[in-house]
Amino acid sequence: VQAKRDPDFMIIARTDARGVEGLEAAVQRAVAYAEAGADALFPEALESAEEFRTFAHEIQKRGVTVPLIANMTEFGKTPLLSVAEFERLGYRGVLFPVTALRTALQAIDRLLAELKLFGSQRDWLHHMMTRQELYDLLRYKDSHERWEGRTYEHSNE
């Protein structure tokens, strides 16, 4: 924390104590992290909305004012709560670390199975971005204009 030089760099202190030592241990560690200078606190593996509420209340009661961050990882012990629900519980940010990846990989798996079975992607077109949507997302035109006319020649000498 003391070595932090960039004001835009945020140190989010994570505690996994809840799963092993209980909620009170997680609160104690989080308070220590805040006192050491953490910019935000991230309690991992809380098991109910009530635990999230209690954690936030206990942190605040002990004078800690840094933002709280929640983690929404599917198929774990944490219930699937919405961003609005977390906000009502006292959390200022929510991480969805593998939601998009899991969704994309399942779609890829299904597409490949259908390609193997039917040999065509025709029935998947409505699931796909158009070429223009992809270019817009990647800001292709900006990159093309920036690099147009520039070439790189590699020499084996």
Predicted features along the sequence, with ranges:
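Alpha/beta enzyme core
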Residues: 1-96, 102, 106-113, 144, ...
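Flexible C-terminal active-site loop/helix
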Residues: 115-157
